[in-house]
Amino acid sequence: MKPEKKRILTTGEIDNSCFNKKSGGARTTVNGSPTDEKAFKVVSTLAGCQRLLRISHILLRHVEVDTRTYFLFSTLVAAGGRTLPSGGRGQGSKLTGEAI
């Protein structure tokens, strides 16, 4: 059987097939065991406007992520995982603690 090609989600792409509509979560596989978690939400600034990206289980399943990176990413998601533009205050983008 041919190995599946690794696929990285592009900006603005949403893969709805992995979302559990009832719980609003995504079916995620961690270390081979499925867990039902919230979809990862990342806000990115493109062409002067914010787009909401949902990074699904495809990211974790098809991209090799070491343990340290996974926990860092999980921590950012738990903290809100949102970077917001400064709004012209000259502070650059910053990480806020908004709940997802």
UniProtKB/Swiss-Prot annotation:
Source species, domain of life: Viruses
Name of the protein this chain belongs to: Uncharacterized 10.6 kDa protein
